[in-house]
Amino acid sequence: MLIPSKLSRPVRLDHTVVRERLLAKLSGANNFRLALITSPAGYGKTTLVSQWAAGKSELGWFSLDEGDNQQERFASYLIAAIQQATNGHCTASEVMAQKRQYASLSSLFAQLFIELAEWHQPLYLVIDDYHLITNPVIHESMRFFLRHQPENLTLVVMSRNLPQLGIANLRVRDQLLEIGSQQLAFNHQEAKQFFDRRLTSPIEAAESSRMCDDVSGWATALQLIALSARQNSHSAHQSARRLSGINASHLSDYLVDEVLNNVDLATRHFLLKSAILRSMNDALITRVTGEENGQMRLEEIERQGLFLQRMDDSGEWFSYHPLFGNFLRQRCQWELAAELPEIHLAAAESWMAQGFPSEAIHHALAAGDASMLRDILLNHAWGLFNHSELALLEESLKALPWESLLENPRLVLLQAWLMQSQHRYSEVNTLLARAEQEIKGEMTGTLHAEFNALRAQVAINAGNPEEAERLARLALDELPIAWFYSRIVATSVHGEVLHCKGDLSRSLALMQQTEQMARHHDVWHYALWSLIQQSEIYFAQGFLQAAWETQDKAFQLIKEQHLEQLPMHEFLVRIRAQLLWAWSRLDEAEASARSGIEVLSSFQPQQQLQCLALLVQCSLARGDLDNARTLLNRLENLLGNGQYHSDWISNADKVRVIYWQMTGDKKAAANWLSQTPKPEFANNHFLQGQWRNIARAQILLGEFEPAEIVLEELNENARQLRLMSDLNRNLLLLNQLYWQAGRKNDAQRVLMEALQLANRTGFISHFVIEGEAMAQQLRQLIQLNTLPELEQHRAQRILREINQHHRHKFAHFDENFVERLLNHPEVPELIRTSPLTQREWQVLGLIYSGYSNEQIAGELEVAATTIKTHIRNLYQKLGVAHRQDAVQHAQQLLKMMGYGV
C-alpha cells in the first residue's frame, strides 16, 4: 500500500514569494530531457517547483525518503507517479510494479516507455530529494530512463548534490536545464517581498537588502530571521548578523537557541515526538504525541512558521522541511532517549491501524520491540512476501531472536521461503532441520506438511526427483484443502517428478490440476509454470499442435497478468522456438529465441545458454556453418564459465555434435565422447537427448555397433513410455547409422517409419539437418512412388528445405558444374551436340532433387506452363521420355563427375 503523501505535490502557501525569474526559466522545461535543481538544504527547491507545477495536470510527483533505496519500493512509487500524471494510462506497467513482475528496473522502464509511446501530450515527472538515493542500481536504471524516455516526457529532479545521472553527457547534448544555489538564492527584491509577508511591521528596503546580503540570499536563514523577529524583542537585523556566514551543517545551535528555546515545553515535545514520522496526519499525530486534536496542532505549528509543509491538496498529510526534520530527530534522540522506543511503538501501532505494515515495521525496528515486530510479521509477512518485499522481510526476521521464530514456526517457514527465492537451497534444509529439532512441543501435522512442500520444491530444484516425490506425497497427505499455496507447490513438484520419470499421462493430469488451483487462488507464477510443463509433455508425446495451443494459453496468461519479465517467460518463448524449429519455421524460431535472450538481458549471460543453442540450431538447419561456428564460440565460452543443469548441457551438446557431424570433425567428437558421462537411465526426453548425442558422436566415429545398441534401447524406452517425439528423432539417427553402414534396406525401413510418425509430430527440420544422405534416400523413395500421400508430401517438403538450405552444387547444376561437365572426356555425345540451356540444367537438377512441376515453378519463380516447355526441351535433348529416365540420366552424370550418389 502506497503512502498518499509521497505522491502529493506540496501545497503552495499564500505567504510564499513567487519566484518569477526562476519560473520563467522553468517554463521551457518541456524542451529538455532533464530539469535539475540542485542546492544545499533550505534554498527553496521544493517550493519553487511546486509553484511551477501549479495548474499542470499531466504531472506526477514523487517525494523520496531513505526507504526508497529498495528497488521495488522505488519502482512502485515512480510508476504510481506516472499513473497520476497520465490518469492511469500505463496499466501494464502499474500491474508489473505492484506485483514485482519485472526482471529489473530498466526492463520495467522499457515496458513503461512502450505504453508512453501512445501518450502524445507533454508529460512531467518530478522526483524530490534525489540525494537520498544511494543504491547504484537505481542510479544506473535512472540513467537508462533518461537515455530512453519519450521526447514528450521531462524529468524534474531536486537534489542537494549533483546526482549520478550522466549529467555531463546531457549538458553537452543541450538536454539539461539547470538551476543551482546561486540562482535559487533570494535577490533584494524577493527578500523585501518575503519580509513584507512575514513581519507585522514593514522594514526598509535598504535594511532588507543588507539582511539578504548577510545570509547570501539563503531562504532558510531569511525564514529564521523572520521567526526570531516575531518571537523575540531583538531586531531582525541582529538575527541576520548572527546567521551571517552560517550554513546547514552549523545550524543546530542556532535552531536550539532561536526556535526550540523560544516555544513552550508542550510545543517543544510535540515537535520532537512528531519528527520521527516521515509523513504525518491527524491519527498518527494523536497517537504519537498524545494530543487529542492532531490536525489542529499541525495547523497551529504551520501558522507559526516552524518549517511544516502540507503534502496534499486536502491538507490531510504534513511533513517537516528536511533540514528541520533531521534537526528535530537528532534532538529527540538526545532529549527523549528514554521515551523514544515508546514513541516509535506508538507510531508503529498507528501505521498498522491505517493499513501500512511496511511503515509499521520501520518503527518497530527502530523501537527494538521484537514482540511488536513479530505480531506485524505474523499478520502481514506473507502479503509482503507475495509483493516481493524481500529485503524488508529479511531485515525484520534477522531482528527477531531465534527463540521467537521457534515459538512461531510459520516465521521459520517464511525465512525458509525467502532463502528458496534467493536460490539458497542448502540453507533451506539446514534451517528447517534445526527448527524441527529445537521447536518446543510437538509440531502440528499441517506445519510438517508445509515444511515438506517447501523441501520438495528444493529437492526438485536440486535435481533429486526421488526425494522430491517422497516429500511432495507426504505434504499432500497431510495438508488441509485450505492450505492452498503449499498444496499448489506439492502438486506441481509431484507432477514434475512424474514428468522426469516419463510417466507423462499422470504428470499431465497433475499439471492441469496445478493450473486450476493456481488460477483459482491467483498464484500466477505456478499457473504459468504448469502450462509450460503441460506444453513440454504434449511435445514429448508427439502432440505438437496441442503443445502449440497450450503455449498460446500461457502467452495469454502472461499478457493478462503482465508476467512478461519473469524468467519463466524465457522458458515459454524457448519451447515455442523449439516447436517452430521442428516445423521448419526457422525465421520465427530464431526471432523467438532472440526474444528469450532479451527477456534475460538483466540476468547473468549464462542464463542465455539454451536460447543461444537454439540460434545455433537454426543456423545448422539453414546449412549456415559459418554463423553456427560464431555462435558456438559464444556458447562454448558460456559452458566453460558456469555450472549448469544436465538438461542444459544436453541441449548445448546437441548442437555441438551436429556441427561436428556436418563438418566431419571426428577429433572434437572423440574428445567430447571420452569426457562425457553416460546417463544412468533414458526414461524421459531429457535423458534420451543426451544418449542421442552420444550415439551421434559414435556414428560419426564409425562406432556403429555401440551406437546401434544405444539407439535400440532408446527406442524400446520411448515406445514403452510413449515418448513419440524422441522415437521420431531416434529413428532418424538410426536411419543414418544404417545408411552409413551400408544397410540400405534397414535404413529405408526406419526412414519410412519416421516419415509416418512425422504425420503426428509434424517434424521437418529433424530430417533436414541430416543433409544430403537424407536427400538421397528421400529421392529414391519418391521415385519408387510407394509412399502414402501424406508421407509423399512430407518427403517432398523436406527435400525442398534441404535444397534451399543445403545447396550442394551438383543438385542444382550451376554454371561451374556444367562447364566442368561439358569438358569431361566421357560426357555423352548427345550432351555435346545438343547442349542444354542454363535454365534447363537448373530444371534437371530440381527434377533430380524430387521436385514436382509446381514446386520447380515456385523455386524458379516462373509459370508452370514455362516449366513444362523446359522439361519437354530437356527430355528431347537427353533422349528420354519419362521423369524417372531423366533422374537416372542425371544420376549417371553425377557419378561420372565423381559424386557418390
From Swiss-Prot:
Residues 853-872 bind DNA. GO terms for molecular function: ATP binding; DNA binding; DNA-binding transcription factor activity. Keywords: Activator, ATP-binding, Carbohydrate metabolism, DNA-binding, Nucleotide-binding, Transcription, Transcription regulation. GO terms for biological process: positive regulation of carbohydrate metabolic process; positive regulation of DNA-templated transcription. It comes from the Bacteria. Residues 829-894 form the HTH luxR-type domain. The keyword rRNA processing does not apply. SUPFAM superfamilies: C-terminal effector domain of the bipartite response regulators, P-loop containing nucleoside triphosphate hydrolases, TPR-like. Pfam families: GerE (PF00196), TPR_MalT (PF17874). InterPro entries: P-loop_NTPase, Sig_transdc_resp-reg_C-effctor, TPR-like_helical_dom_sf, TPR_MalT, Tscrpt_reg_HTH_MalT, Tscrpt_reg_LuxR_C, WH-like_DNA-bd_sf. Activated by ATP and maltotriose, which are both required for DNA binding. ATP binds at S39, P40, A41, G42, Y43, G44, K45, T46. CDD domains: LuxR_C_like. Monomer in solution. Oligomerizes to an active state in the presence of the positive effectors ATP and maltotriose. Belongs to the MalT family. Positively regulates the transcription of the maltose regulon whose gene products are responsible for uptake and catabolism of malto-oligosaccharides. Specifically binds to the promoter region of its target genes, recognizing a short DNA motif called the MalT box. This is HTH-type transcriptional regulator MalT. The gene is malT.
